[in-house]
Amino acid sequence: MKKKTALLFFIWFLILECLAGCARQGYSCFMEVGDHEISKEEYALLAYDNIARTAREYGAKEGIDVNAPGFWEQKRDGVSPMDRVRELTDGEAVHQKGIQILAKENGMIDEIGYEAFLKQYQEENKQRKQMKEEGKVLYGPLELSVSQYYSYRQSQLEQALEEFAEQKIVTIREEELKAYYPVVKQAEEKKNFQAKLSLVIFEDAGEEQKAAAEQWIAAHGITDDLPLLLAEETGISASVESMAVDTLELGKENLLLDRVVQAVQEVEAGEVTPAIEYTDGMSAVAVVESKEYAAFGSYDTERDYVEYLLREKKAREYIADEISRLEVKKGKAWETLTYEDIIK
């Protein structure tokens, strides 16, 4: 009888210990990555944006109403929209928890549970409020949302982890640097250029109008009477401005210039870029009059830069490899995650 009682007690102890492993932090058992829990709440935080993405994917299919009752659980070809949300979220959840685990293992943070994160979040907003009251410079909103603080903290952790790996983990031989130099040279020479452009600026009246402007300008090019001809043939009123771009001399952040550079990067001299946002309510098409790529320096002059890029690359590969080794387990709650769990 004593043996039977002892056995039953042992079995109950194991059951309670398993339940405690999932409930230790006060959150529902959901997923585990490398023996560390991802709570339903943390997973839902990451899944939120994938609700909108999944709705767009299904909404683009003919005859599907994403607002219809039961939409999220209805299976089509064996897959429901919630299955798609889980598919999109799983990789991100494992990556983010992996960053936390590696940061903890390397002494950057002490706690990685969601409960500890919420305490840090509350403390951050408390400090921001205090800074405001003391008249100190405050960057960003007075009060961060949970999602904003999560993204900020994870970004900071990942950056710190990359820097740690670059300095403490990654080793580079001279032969590796020499082999990587041509890769960097090709990428840099394609990235940096000087260009002379003509910007055709017009009121943004939708995608059809932008496409019409792009096609007309590509066919006729830049002439002195472009505004008149474009208005007569398409009904689009426009003005023309000249612009010079040198990517090696880009200074302060300029969203317009950034958009221009990104568009011009994809085309060559004599070609026309897709329409870009110029200012609020206005679009522009850039005609590339000339474009010259900047020469990249020799191995000796650019060695430090090449090493910096290679260290960064190897650090990211190291982190990705370490995360890929972590065992991932999914609990029953993962299978029963609902739309309401995510948006509440």
Model-found features: residue ranges?
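N-terminal targeting/tethering segments
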Residues: 23-145
